[in-house]
Amino acid sequence: MLDSKLLRSNLQDVADRLASRGFALDVARIEALEEQRKTVQTRTEQLQAERNARSKSIGQAKQRGEDIAPLMADVERMGNELSSGKAELENIQSELDSILFGIPNLPHESVPVGEDEDGNVEVRRWGTPTAFDFPIKDHVALGETHGWLDFETAAKLSGARFALLRGPIARLHRALAQFMINLHTGEHGYEEAYTPYLVQAPALVGTSQLPKFEEDLFKITREGEADLYLIPTAEVSLTNIVAGEILDAKQLPLKFVAHTPCFRSEAGASGRDTRGMIRQHQFDKVEMVQVVEPSTSMEALEGLTANAEKVLQLLQLPYRVLALCTGDMGFSAVKTYDLEVWVPSQDKYREISSCSNCGDFQARRMQARFRNPETGKPELVHTLNGSGLAVGRTLVAVLENYQQADGSIRVPDVLKPYMGGLEVIG
């Protein structure tokens, strides 16, 4: 979340910057609440001082043998007023906190200004889409022809937006995840982690999915115990490793990677990508997270994005990189790059990774800090996250870009060691 001090001291400037994201900050309401808070706080502090003085005078009156009943009554009355004032302060602060938790991050000055995805800016492209000399099939047709992809059985088991992978495609899916993990740990310096797939609410508050995006989550309610949520991304569990910690500066940067399933309700996706594996309730993803010193986070974003790009380059999959505009960025991001891979059957690029610098936005929620060696004082870290990559969408891209006229699929060179040396499936 944003720094409340920044909000108080530069409210209109913050509102103007948020407007570029299409977010209307209720300046009048915040100003009114702040005025109430100051008034009640001043009154409460004065009342506390008066009560302390009156309490002291009770002892003095006792020593003089005076009737202390009126003083006792005053102290009791002031105590009741203090309790009332503190309760009022708590209510005001609760409303301010509620507003604060609903405010998105401020965009970095380098982020292009725009209302929606049309305002995104293409930064670069890599590779050239294959010019097929035969009628191409989409991944669904390729998979169902051989019985490798079974959406009918998946629907019988779980409903819409699930997939059952079998045989060579299941193996190819596993190979992709193993390849990605090995690349990031072996060449990019990430520490592999195996994390819980179920987390409690504070973890999701820390990474900003709660309270604003609860409808996108799958929730498990347990009688007498804390609710649990299925992770929408390993970003949640990986980033929260440092929640509540004060790290030594020598520990930074921390770089974590994990291969996990992800679970999303896709509440706002009705009618979109209903065919195939592009948009699922359950999908696998290899997630990268970095925890860094504030001065290095923008440079770290470039490195994180390059790590994700390397996966696509080694797989020889054409892609492009977009700098997301202010109106299309995620809630907690300062700056985001999207990687989009070429999907031949759709004749367009589709998102396969989103790499974001969240600045101190998540760290403030989590109270994740490091000790500044120059001042000796704790300061908030910066957090970054990115897909490296979404495994299911990468599988889609491999199937379609490596298809042959007879419906078989060539195995990318870097995956052959994970496929027992197979060169073609189908």
Swiss-Prot record:
Binding site for ATP: R264, S265, E266, E351, I352, S353, S354
Places the protein is found: Cytoplasm
Chief subcellular location: cytoplasm
Keyword list, A-Z: Aminoacyl-tRNA synthetase, ATP-binding, Cytoplasm, Ligase, Nucleotide-binding, Protein biosynthesis
Record flagged with keyword Protein biosynthesis: yes
Binding residues annotated for L-serine, in chain numbering: T233, A234, E235, E287, S387
Single Gene Ontology BP annotation: seryl-tRNA aminoacylation
Transmembrane region(s): none
Region Disordered, residue ranges: 41-64
GO terms for MF: ATP binding; serine-tRNA ligase activity
Keyword DNA-binding on entry: no
Compositionally biased region (Polar residues): 41-60
GO cellular component: cytoplasm
Organism superkingdom: Bacteria
EC number: 6.1.1.11
Enzyme class: ligase
Pathway connected to this protein: Aminoacyl-tRNA biosynthesis; selenocysteinyl-tRNA(Sec) biosynthesis; L-seryl-tRNA(Sec) from L-serine and tRNA(Sec): step 1/1
Cystine residue pairs: none
Catalytic activity: tRNA(Ser) + L-serine + ATP = L-seryl-tRNA(Ser) + AMP + diphosphate + H(+); tRNA(Sec) + L-serine + ATP = L-seryl-tRNA(Sec) + AMP + diphosphate + H(+)
Entry-linked InterPro entries: aa-tRNA-synt_IIb (IPR002314), aa-tRNA-synth_II (IPR006195), aa-tRNA-synth_II/BPL/LPL (IPR045864), Ser-tRNA-ligase_type_1 (IPR002317), Ser-tRNA-synth_1_N (IPR015866), SerRS_1_N_sf (IPR042103), SerRS_core (IPR033729), tRNA-bd_arm (IPR010978)
Function field: Catalyzes the attachment of serine to tRNA(Ser). Is also able to aminoacylate tRNA(Sec) with serine, to form the misacylated tRNA L-seryl-tRNA(Sec), which will be further converted into selenocysteinyl-tRNA(Sec).
Entry domain remark: Consists of two distinct domains, a catalytic core and a N-terminal extension that is involved in tRNA binding.
Record text on subunit structure and interactions: Homodimer. The tRNA molecule binds across the dimer.
Family stated for the protein in its record: Belongs to the class-II aminoacyl-tRNA synthetase family. Type-1 seryl-tRNA synthetase subfamily.
Official protein name in the record: Serine--tRNA ligase
Encoding gene, per UniProt annotation: serS
